[in-house]
């Protein structure tokens, strides 16, 4: 027997050189266009994150700057603390710049390169993809035709081998069977001879076609290599370009290498190191401690021309440097805060008590009883006047009430010189509110 045929012996490889396996290289061109879109989406999402973070920093700085300015901290440490808010504002601006660079530079750069590198066709797809497809198909067409002939020749040869083996088996078995006549035996022998001739013919043809394929293979490889290198050059441009873009993105994101960013933290450190505890203590001693001036009691001659009163006189609001006295609670509010509200917040850094000394508890604003007609401003009055809100009001301080137009509340005192009244909500909350925001019911 000249050979054997076994269909299971056929191997299907995944090599680039197999017919049609160039399609992965062609698909890479389409993938490159999609990857440009993916990178632009990636940059857009990061830009949104930068924008949101910048806004959060701004909101945080605004809120805490107000709290610090209205809080009890004072002096150089207050300035150091406030420097953190300045840092947040500046870093917010830098992250806004990052967002702008990502969108206006990096994303636009990718978009423009993609537009120049890929050209859409009217019928769909890209010109570059079609050119690669046509190039590979043209280079592979002659070799693919030879491979088709080779497969047919191989199949014919293997089939002839199979028939030869079957004929030989029948001829050998007939020798042991008594029922087979000499004439039948001769036919079986002739069949074996004919199959051997077929095997010889198909083998010669198979070998000839295989030789022809071998001759055309170098030209086939050269043509395929040429088209593949063109695709490689196109892909190389994409890879190099996207690497440059990623480096640009890194440069924009890496604020650690930004001179402005480093300057922000140098300034912050200087502001913090500028805080001086001893200076702050001296300031507090001179403005709120034993270092304050005092009109000590002195003997005063009776003057008949002056009105004589036996009741305790109220001390008129005394103008202090950078502060005004509020008659609502007897506290001094810094002029920097006077623009926010013309009364006293739950805590004002310049708070002083301007009451003259008396052994009568009526002069104590924190006393629990009344004397000489003086009421405790912090006591929950049992009586009051019901009023209705004309407008919405959101309290700006902890000691202010918040209400909506139409809400009813209880007015507990008369309007002070700066237009504020004390009142109580139905929930029991006590606080101040603008007098002209309500009307009597």
UniProtKB/Swiss-Prot annotation:
The modification Phosphothreonine is found at residue 181. The modification Phosphotyrosine is found at residue 391. Keywords: Cell membrane, Cell projection, Coiled coil, Cytoplasm, Cytoplasmic vesicle, Endocytosis, Lipid-binding, Membrane, Phosphoprotein, SH3 domain, Synapse, Synaptosome. The keyword Cell membrane applies. Changing residue 434 to L: Abolishes interaction with DNM1, MAPT, SYNJ1 and WASL. Pfam families: FCH (PF00611), SH3_9 (PF14604). Residues 311-321 have a biased composition (Basic and acidic residues). Highly expressed in brain. Detected in hippocampus and dorsal root ganglion neurons. Detected in rod photoreceptor terminals in the outer plexiform layer of the retina (at protein level). In CNS neurons, high levels in the pyramidal cells of the hippocampus, Purkinje cells of the cerebellum and large neurons of the cortex and brain stem. One of its GO terms (cellular component) is myelin sheath. Residues 297-380 are annotated as: Disordered. The modification Phosphoserine is found at residues 2, 76, 343, 345-346, 358, 362, 402, 427. Residues 23-272 form a coiled coil. The F-BAR domain forms a coiled coil and mediates membrane-binding and membrane tubulation. In the autoinhibited conformation, interaction with the SH3 domain inhibits membrane tubulation mediated by the F-BAR domain. DNM1 binding abolishes autoinhibition. This is Protein kinase C and casein kinase substrate in neurons protein 1. It comes from Mus musculus (Mouse).
